[in-house]
């Protein structure tokens, strides 16, 4: 039964396949023919559009040549053309503006380069044949789909005109309203576009006003500015600063008399009238540079990665070369400065002091006092300070590694001192003894890390060095090295007196005060004297570290020369030091009436009743003991020397110029009673007044208030801002080059040893790592190589 049905089934399948293949082929031929017809219709439509557009231009051309047009004339031919063209264009626009046009074209009209069998259609045909032996009309379905596609296109936006045609109609209507061609051209002349073109041409042809107003620099001005900016180099060659200023003034004055600065405004001219010749030259150069549009973008050595001021919190780091319990000026005065600066809420203060290993502590600190940890020494420092100032100072104390040099009798920093101030706190640096801190400094440049660096000169090193072997040669070298490091690492230098070396960027101002305890002692003694009691019951004394350079040589020479004149005058001497034995031997040799005692604090009770303090030293920069003696209401006999200039205004300060005058002043002081201090004199000696002077002369008040006053600068600030905005600063370039050369030289251990550096001070050692919990220098500053 099954075998009989098999042949009919095979023939039916074959007939179905042949029939299906024929239908697919016919359908593909029909689709291809339809695509050809559509392409021809598009081509014809484009041809007709081009032809009628050409007719439009031809018909519109005569209208523009007519000299006058009447508003009552019939509509031009182009309007009728647009009306005829509108249906075709609308159909064309609707066909191509449909958002689904491209998608539908790809779906409906995609080209079929190869004829493929639609398997789904075959499947449907087989099913259809199996059920009712019917055949699906594929052609009718395709035609129905095409009709629905065109119906969708025709149904979209029939009521809207094509955008270009609508714009064209609007322009033609506006053109019809013109009464004549004259009005047309008048409107063109008054159009906004033409006005803009005219103004642009005027601005292009106009010469810059500033370039006419500011005369160019002449040779004399260029030479004057070159000499002024070459000051650092000439200073290293030994040319004095006043000589350079005279050369600059002579060169610039000739040009100034001819020019009279006509390019400057009245406000700037008034500023020049109140300033010196250097400021006038700077502003003249700045005005020329501004007229050319030049703006200074910073120097070659400028480092912009400095402290961020966005948090409006300022930080002051005070770095010094000594620490308590060593009773020296560089240990005591920076401590008081930190305490009084911390009273202001404008800034936070950090005091950075040297940490000595135990072996060095035994050599430096008195009474065999040593510390096992930085925390223990910090506690000692704070207790000592609070006992004297009477309030709790809110500042931070940090330590950097140092080594004591017995040859130089000072502490030399070991490693990069600047690295012990975190970058987030690197805002303002105060370097106590900047030359000492930077002689062998091998590390980050202070002015690169900090926004403002102030150096305070405490010691007259040149005077000390001259007393040594080959002192003249050493002093010559040290003088230029001091100039070198001061230029390279400081923005401002304060000299406590004119006795110090005239360093670059420096001014003279006493920014030290006295311990408040001394003022209280003076007040108590003055109160006793007002009650009729005798305040001073003892004679004369001298106090200081017992080394020859601290005035002991001058003291013994004066007493020996006028031994007869000062017969009966007994002098008590308090001090410890390396030259104690030699000083005492010299006094015995001359049979001087000197009573040597161990050193003690100047505020000790045993010293309150002395009436006369004798200080013949001429090596001091500003003797702290002299200020303390004046604060206690004593007489002071001192040399007529620049180091004592600050004290001359006090009536109890008796200065002498000759050895004979010394004897006269000592007798005068012993025979009379000191004058009581006035409130103004007490304030002048106080740390409050010293801090105020420091803020003013270091320009720290301007730096701290820069953010607040930036919105409303003063006249002087505007002058400085005008100069800094345009002038390329040769000085900064020189300073950066000096700092780089110094860094290279101090990195060589052989050169360091040749110049007297303590061995092993380029980096800190293992004991410092242990005491301060530091990483080894090889890890902290690795050296990479191949």
Curated annotation (Swiss-Prot):
SUPFAM superfamilies named in the record: UDP-Glycosyltransferase/glycogen phosphorylase
Subcellular location: Plastid, Chloroplast outer membrane; Plastid outer membrane
Enzyme Commission number: 2.4.1.241
GO BP: galactolipid biosynthetic process; nodulation
Source organism superkingdom: Eukaryota
Tissue: High expression in nodules infected cells, but low in nodule inner cortex and root central cylinder.
Keywords from the UniProt entry: Chloroplast, Glycosyltransferase, Membrane, Nodulation, Plastid, Plastid outer membrane, Transferase, Transit peptide
Molecular-function annotations in GO: digalactosyldiacylglycerol synthase activity
Keyword Transferase: yes
GO CC entries: chloroplast outer membrane
InterPro entries on file: DGDG1/2, Glyco_trans_1
TM segment ranges: none
Reactions listed under catalytic activity: a 1,2-diacyl-3-O-(beta-D-galactosyl)-sn-glycerol + UDP-alpha-D-galactose = a 1,2-diacyl-3-O-[alpha-D-galactosyl-(1->6)-beta-D-galactosyl]-sn-glycerol + UDP + H(+)
Stretch forming the transit peptide: 1-25
Protein role: Involved in the synthesis of diacylglycerol galactolipids that are specifically found in thylakoid and in nodule peribacteroid membranes. Specific for alpha-glycosidic linkages.
Family that this chain belongs to: Belongs to the glycosyltransferase group 1 family. Glycosyltransferase 4 subfamily.
Protein name: Digalactosyldiacylglycerol synthase 1, chloroplastic
Species this chain originates from: Lotus japonicus (Lotus corniculatus var. japonicus)
